[in-house]
Amino acid sequence: MNLKDYIATIENYPKEGITFRDISPLMADGNAYSYAVREIVQYATDKKVDMIVGPEARGFIVGCPVAFELGXGFAPVRKPGKLPREVISADYEKEYGVDTLTMHADAIKPGQRVLIVDDLLATGGTVKATIEMIEKLGGVMAGCAFLVELDELNGREKIGDYDYKVLMHY
């Protein structure tokens, strides 16, 4: 199945000069959505994953069904002020400044094998901050999986030597 057939391209969104890759059509098509989830599950199966971590919000959409299929837990990564209990945080650089991500301080137990699942790998800031928090909690990085990678932004450099899977490259 060619998943790119289910990605909408919107020019100059959210601002001039940006090409936005919209995964909504993929999510709206049951066959394409399940195919994408199965591809990530297949990648994760041999990694003996205990926990899926997904950054908000589209990481939830992709990560939760992967966790369900694997019989693993799911831990959300959110912006500050969105999680109700004690959190840890990590800062990351965006195009115009610094932002912060958080996750519950008890989300990962030491030694748990963790797979990060998200819709998009762009500059890599989100995944780098997420890796930092997982390692701070004693988690073992099993890898990362993304629906889409924007190759020209070199986000893969922020993943370092960790294994990762991408379903579509742009």
From Swiss-Prot:
Gene3D superfamilies (UniProt xref): 3.40.50.2020
GO biological process: adenine salvage; AMP salvage; purine ribonucleoside salvage
Domain of life: Bacteria
Catalyzed reaction equations: AMP + diphosphate = 5-phospho-alpha-D-ribose 1-diphosphate + adenine
UniProt pathway annotation: Purine metabolism; AMP biosynthesis via salvage pathway; AMP from adenine: step 1/1
Pfam family of the protein (one): Pribosyltran
Enzyme Commission designation: 2.4.2.7
Recorded GO CC terms: cytoplasm
Keywords attached to this entry: Cytoplasm, Glycosyltransferase, Purine salvage, Transferase
Subcellular localization: Cytoplasm
CDD domains referenced in this protein's UniProt entry, alphabetically: PRTases_typeI (cd06223)
InterPro entries in the record: Ade_phspho_trans (IPR005764), PRibTrfase_dom (IPR000836), PRTase-like (IPR029057), UPRTase/APRTase (IPR050054)
Chief location category: cytoplasm
PROSITE patterns: PUR_PYR_PR_TRANSFER
GO molecular function: adenine binding; adenine phosphoribosyltransferase activity; AMP binding
NCBIfam families, alphabetized: apt, PRK02304.1-2, PRK02304.1-3, PRK02304.1-5
Function text: Catalyzes a salvage reaction resulting in the formation of AMP, that is energically less costly than de novo synthesis.
UniProt-listed HAMAP family: Aden_phosphoribosyltr
Subunit-level organization: Homodimer.
Family (UniProt): Belongs to the purine/pyrimidine phosphoribosyltransferase family.
Protein name: Adenine phosphoribosyltransferase
Organism: Streptococcus pneumoniae serotype 19F (strain G54)
Lineage, highest ranks first: Bacteria, Bacillati, Bacillota, Bacilli, Lactobacillales
